[in-house]
């Protein structure tokens, strides 16, 4: 799915969002001296200062250059990010598409001025004006990284890459002759409903699913039925990267949705693991650095947004996280990422990814995210 061509929102929702655009009046007109501090909510592994590996540090140089000391609060899910931003006390958040529109609608983030970010001109054209951070032609953040939700698998179990997501959704024996029950994982977040919908788009074409984030009642019921049938198969609903890596190493997990971050970490640890994007395609995420509506350190925030778009920073983040840079130039000449890093992580798969976005009712045509949340919690609980 090519998300930049997707219709953004219904007229009703657009009107709601536009009402929140008044915050732009208080936005910076020029970037001045930093306030000395910057507080960021981020995914684990997104803001590294060399503590995990000395080679991966894109914070120390920023602090030395700007005088802005960076404090990071990690969040394991988009729902946690929305909760933290609602409580306040942070300047920036690295929001995925299933959080960004909620933050905009809830007036928790403010518009930014791309003309105050010199490196904006280096952005990948495919990401400019993405509907997950642009509403009514107003820009609500700076792209940071993107990537697919891959199918991770144990190479001792699968001698060739699995061709379908059915290995995690449908009861079956895996290639080693043993059942998949208790050996697969699913993501611990309502947005995973879209993964099931994407699978059924191919597996049950009679449902006529076009967009896995826009499900009619009939389509939605079929997706929930699939997820309820999957529940007894699931070893764990994962959201913590470290826990999933441990499960793969120690608990016999043979297949799961995952991120490049975990796959790369397990491969580096000499584990028999690889990843693939099956025939049905994959969901994915395009993360945006968004500015809190009441940010206390806006100058440091703008300095960070510009810093984050440097090719070296983008390439280093992509190498560490197993993601893809939003600046194409970052794919070249990065020692950590390597010459084939962008290709390996899926740089050319953009149009095959159904990027996360917040499901909207659009006048009652589709099932909204609030229902996704209620129903997925029930499914994970076995109801």
Locate predicted features.
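Early extracytoplasmic/lumenal segment of secretory-pathway proteins
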Residues: 25-103
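Extracytoplasmic ligand-binding site segments that recognize negatively charged/polar headgroups
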Residues: 48-54, 94, 99-243
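Paired acidic/hydrophobic, glycine-rich loop segments that form the ligand-binding mouth/hinge
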Residues: 91-95, 237, 254-259, 274-275
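A ligand-binding cleft/hinge motif common to bilobed small-molecule-binding domains
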Residues: 99-102, 256-272
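Periplasmic-binding protein-like
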Residues: 122, 221-230, 269-293
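A bilobed periplasmic-binding-protein/Venus flytrap-type ligand-binding module shared by bacterial periplasmic
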Residues: 152-157, 198-201, 285-297, 316
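Mature extracytoplasmic/periplasmic domains
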Residues: 292-356
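Conserved C-terminal helix/tail region of periplasmic/extracytoplasmic solute-binding proteins
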Residues: 352-383
């Amino acid at each position: 799915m090519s998300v930049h061509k997707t219709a953004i929102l219904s007229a009703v929702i657009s009107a709601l969002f536009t009402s929140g655009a008044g915050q732009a009046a208080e936005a910076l007109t020029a970037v001045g001296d930093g306030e000395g501090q910057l507080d960021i909510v981020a995914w684990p592994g997104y803001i590294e200062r060399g503590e995990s590996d000395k080679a991966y540090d894109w914070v120390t140089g920023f602090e030395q250059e700007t005088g802005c000391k960076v404090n990071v609060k990690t969040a394991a899910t988009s729902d946690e990010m929305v909760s933290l931003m609602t409580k306040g006390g942070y300047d920036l958040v690295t929001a995925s598409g299933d959080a960004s529109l909620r933050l905009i609608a809830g007036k928790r983030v403010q518009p930014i001025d791309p003309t105050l970010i010199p490196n904006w001109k280096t952005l990948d054209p495919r990401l400019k004006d993405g509907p997950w951070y642009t509403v009514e032609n107003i820009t609500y953040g700076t792209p940071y990284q993107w990537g697919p939700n891959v199918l991770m698998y144990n190479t001792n179990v699968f001698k060739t890459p699995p061709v379908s997501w059915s290995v995690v959704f449908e009861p079956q024996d895996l290639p080693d002759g043993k059942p998949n029950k208790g050996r697969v994982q699913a993501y611990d977040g309502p947005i995973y409903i879209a993964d099931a919908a994407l699978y059924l788009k191919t597996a049950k074409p009679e449902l006529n699913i076009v967009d896995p984030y826009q499900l009619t009642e009939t389509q939605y019921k079929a997706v929930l039925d699939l997820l309820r049938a999957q529940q007894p198969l699931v070893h764990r609903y994962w959201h913590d990267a470290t826990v999933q890596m441990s499960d793969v190493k120690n608990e016999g997990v043979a297949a799961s949705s995952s991120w490049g971050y975990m796959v790369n970490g397990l491969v580096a640890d000499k584990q028999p693991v690889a990843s693939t994007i099956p025939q049905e395609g994959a969901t994915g995420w395009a993360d945006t650095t968004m500015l809190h509506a009441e940010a206390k350190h806006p100058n440091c925030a703008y300095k960070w947004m510009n810093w984050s778009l440097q090719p070296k920073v983008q390439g280093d983040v992509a190498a560490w996280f197993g993601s893809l840079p939003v600046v194409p130039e970052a794919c070249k000449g990065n020692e950590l990422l390597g010459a084939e890093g962008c290709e390996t992580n899926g740089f050319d798969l953009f149009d095959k990814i159904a990027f996360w976005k917040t499901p909207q009712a659009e006048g009652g045509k589709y099932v909204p995210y609030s229902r996704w949340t209620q129903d997925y919690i029930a499914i994970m609980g076995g109801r």
